[in-house]
Amino acid sequence: FKVTPALLHRTVKALILGDLLMKCLYRVRPYEVEKGAANRLYEQWDVIVREALEHHGFSKTAAKTPWLKRRYLPYPVLAREIVKSFDALPLKDVPRKVRVGVVGEILVKYQPDANNHVVDVIESQDCEAVVPGIMEFMTTRPYITDWNEKYLGTGGNKTLYALMRWSLDRYNAPIKAAIATSHGKFKQDDPMPELVEKAAEVTSIGVQAGEGWLLTAEILELIEQGCPNVICAQPFACLPNHVTGRGMFG
């Protein structure tokens, strides 16, 4: 295949919407009244989002879904309806469960077969899993150009990175607006500049091998959001992750 602007546009939207679906699913699943309801809702949205991204916002599955009944779902509407549907899912009236965060090497963090199904284990212990999104990992470079320029002399094209930051803000705006309608049920992610500042208080932004300083920033973000229990998952052979992950735990 050929990488085109249109493909990149859809890829960014897919990654951001994937993060949103993960956030919503993990937030409500431990509290669902009807077992399996959250997974079924996720599976419906998985099909709808795929169709909408592939067919420029149109989804035949969405048109046939009783609680949706609309064929055209542009990106902002997708975000809003995803949050709305998960927010409306019936939940048990119980206190918030102990939250356990998951950070680490990018494959092990998200791939159930690689992390021994860590989210399932967390939920089986009557806890709630919290996993930072993959877009944070994919978009660190534009936010550390000043540090790289000052200390490494290789900041890159500042105009290009400024354009990337502006574009990412535009992509994230509908997600933030959608999450805001849930009145606190779903947490907003910290802006990337704030994550850079958090990490700089504990480690150096020059720690860029593997997940680098971002892993530290995610741990701090989780702690500040009321999730002091954090699993740092890493494969045996990933030395940078062992150093930055285990080192920061120490």
Describe the predicted segments one by one.
Residues F1-G250:
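An N-terminal assembly and electron-transfer interface module characteristic of large anaerobic redox
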